[in-house]
């Protein structure tokens, strides 16, 4: 049996640094320890691991089936699951977000490998959505458990609806599932109610106390749980960032709160002027 990995938390809310892992010696024990650590810490930092493309693919496959992206270029035709993210080609993701929540089954996890990066700057930050939910008031928690939110991509071509509160498998902890980049509307509420509530949730979850931050070095690998975190790049450098990425596909298993109330979609009264035109500048 391989020696146990050393798991050292890096922040109070989430994140842990992993040492003792070799990219060319991935066994069942190491895989089990990584999966357990990810469930606990949500983000794992593997400094200086420097895997080959094949090794990086194999690490990702420990967590489930990997996505073959339809249009982001892959690094190697032999390993189509590994795509290339180049800051000189694609825009930096400097808004707090969870990836592709406009999908019917958003990803379970994601991995990044820093291939080329600046000497300093260009850090990445993550937020713990479980801690975010825990700190909400009890009345608001009760209200949120019966609500959903529609998410769409920036072009509006893809749309999905998800519960605002999700349950973490294995622990039963609840997490908030909205993000500023893709979350658009709470259909059970009027438009102004939805706008005000989402604005509050966005502000609440972006508090620094819920976050961790990683200063990249070439060769670093980061793995994170996409279901209960948000992330954002710190856009403070113009130097190139070249990363390899792998994404663990989601499944259709429901993470909704069991027995949560079900509310119908809000219907505005178009037979009344206030409902048709809105009042006070609001569109209902």
Residue ranges and their predicted role:
Residues 2-221, 226-284:
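Non-heme Fe(II) oxygenase catalytic core, chiefly the N-lobe of the double-stranded beta-helix
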């Amino acid at each position: 049996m391989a020696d146990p990995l050393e798991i050292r938390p890096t922040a109070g809310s989430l994140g842990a640094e992993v040492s003792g892992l070799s990219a060319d010696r991935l066994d069942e024990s190491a895989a089990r320890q990584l999966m357990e650590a990810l469930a606990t810490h949500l983000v794992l930092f593997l400094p200086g691991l420097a895997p080959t493309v094949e090794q990086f693919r194999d690490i990702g496959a420990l967590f489930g089936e990997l996505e073959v992206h339809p249009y982001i270029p892959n690094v190697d035709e032999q390993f189509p699951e590994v795509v290339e993210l180049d800051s000189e080609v694609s825009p930096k993701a400097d808004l707090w977000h969870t990836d592709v929540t406009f999908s019917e089954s958003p990803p379970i996890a994601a991995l990044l490998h820093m291939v080329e990066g600046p000497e300093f700057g260009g850090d990445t930050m993550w937020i713990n959505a479980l801690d975010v939910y825990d700190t909400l008031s009890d009345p608001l928690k009760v209200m949120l458990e019966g609500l959903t939110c529609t998410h769409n991509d920036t072009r509006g071509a893809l749309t999905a609806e998800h519960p605002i509160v999700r349950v973490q498998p294995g622990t039963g902890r609840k997490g908030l599932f909205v993000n500023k980049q893709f979350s658009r509307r709470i259909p059970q509420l009027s438009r102004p109610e939805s706008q005000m509530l989402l604005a509050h949730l966005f502000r609440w979850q972006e508090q620094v106390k819920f976050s961790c931050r990683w200063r990249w070095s070439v060769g670093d690998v980061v793995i994170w749980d996409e279901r209960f975190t948000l992330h954002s790049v710190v856009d403070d450098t113009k130097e190139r960032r070249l990363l390899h990425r792998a994404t663990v596909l989601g499944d259709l298993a429901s993470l909704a709160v069991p027995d949560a109330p079900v509310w119908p979609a809000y219907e505005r009264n178009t037979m009344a002027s206030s409902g048709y035109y809105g009042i006070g500048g609001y569109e209902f």
